[in-house]
Amino acid sequence: MNNPDLKTILSSWQGTPVDKHGRFMNHEFPGTQTFGNALKWTFEKNPQKQTKKNDTWHMQVVKDDNFLHTEEDVVVLLGHSTFFIRLDGKQLVIDPVFGDLSMHTRYTDFPIETAKLVNIDYVLISHSHYDHCDKASLKIIQSQNPDAVFLAGLGMKDLLSQWVGTNEVQQAGWYQQYKLDDGLEIYFLPARHSSRRFINDTNKRLWGAFVLKSKKKTIYYGGDSGYGSHYREAGELFPGIDVALIGVGAYSPRWFMLPNHQDPQQAVQAFNDIRATMMIPFHYGTFDMADEPLSEPEDILSKAAEGNKVKHQIRIVKPGEAVILD
C-alpha cells in the first residue's frame, strides 16, 4: 500500500505491507505484541522497582528560546521525542507533546513557552501513539500556525484532520517523498514499531521514520523503533547523514519491549549502521514508560559509546539545548 499521489523512491518497493485484515505490518519482523502480553507486563513484578525508587536523577532543562530568533540551521530536543528543527530557513516540529499525558506525568518542564512556537512550516508525526501524537499539543500548534503542513504516515489523515482543521495533511507510505515546493525534501521511511490509540485500531495507522534533506544538511529522525536492518538501509539510501536522532529509552523488560524499542546498545549499533556524523539520543527522561530507571538509558548509552569508540560523535543534550549545524 502507498499514496499514489506521492513519489516512491525505492524502485523495487511494492508498497507498505498489510495483512488480510488491512493492518500494516513490519516487513522485516511481521507480527505485533498482543493485548495479553501487555496485560502480563502490567501485572508482573518489576525487578528494578527498588532501583527506580532510589533513582533521584532528573534531566536538566535549558530554558533559553534564543534559537527561535536566529536563522541558523539548528536541532533542539524539547523533551521526550519532540524536536524543533530549522533547515534552510524552514521551521519544523516533530512529534509535539507539551505537557502531561493521560497516563504519564511529565518529569521535565517544557523548555520554552508554547506560545512562541509560531512560523512553523511543517509538523511531522511519526505515529499515532499518545506520547508522539498528542491532541492538545497539535491543537495548540495548529491555532498558532494556520498555514503549517502536517506530514504523517498512511491512515493518519482521518485522525489529524479532526484536530488541525483545514490545514493540509499529507500521508505517506514507506519510502515515499512528501510533496513540498520550497526546496526542502522530506521522506517517510520504515521503523520497527506498531500503532494503537483505541482497542480496535491496532496497526491501522502507519508508523515510520523521517529523513529531512536540505541543500547542505541531512537529518534522520528514527521515531519509535526496535532494532533492524532499516537503519542500514537508511544510510545506504541517504549517504552522508549529518545528524541521526535515535530513541534510547523505554526498553525494559526486553521480552516485551524488544520489537518496539531498541536499548541503548542497539541504538549505538543503529547509529553505526546509518553512518551518520552525529547522534542525538531521545525518548528518555521525560516520561516514565517502562521498567528501567529514568537515569539508566543515559548511563548505558555513555558506556556503549565508549566501547564502540563513538563517544565524540554521540551528543547527549538537555531539553532546550540548541545544537547549531555548522
Role assignments for model-derived ranges:
Residues 96-110, 194-201, 252-261, 288:
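Acidic/histidine-rich helix-loop elements
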Residues 95, 125, 187, 246, ...:
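Redox-cofactor binding/interface segments in oxidoreductases and associated redox assembly factors
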Residues 84-86, 179-242, 258, 262-265:
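Catalytic core of the metallo-beta-lactamase
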Residues 99-101, 105, 110-178, 190-195:
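Active-site HxH/HxHxD metal-binding segment of metal-dependent hydrolases
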Residues 3-4, 12-13, 19, 24-27, ...:
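Cap/insert and terminal regions of metallo-dependent hydrolase folds
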Residues 77, 150, 171-177, 207-210, ...:
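Tryptophan-centric aromatic hotspots in well-structured domains and transmembrane helices
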Residues 1-102, 113-116, 153-221, 242-249, 300-321, 325, ...:
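Metallo-beta-lactamase
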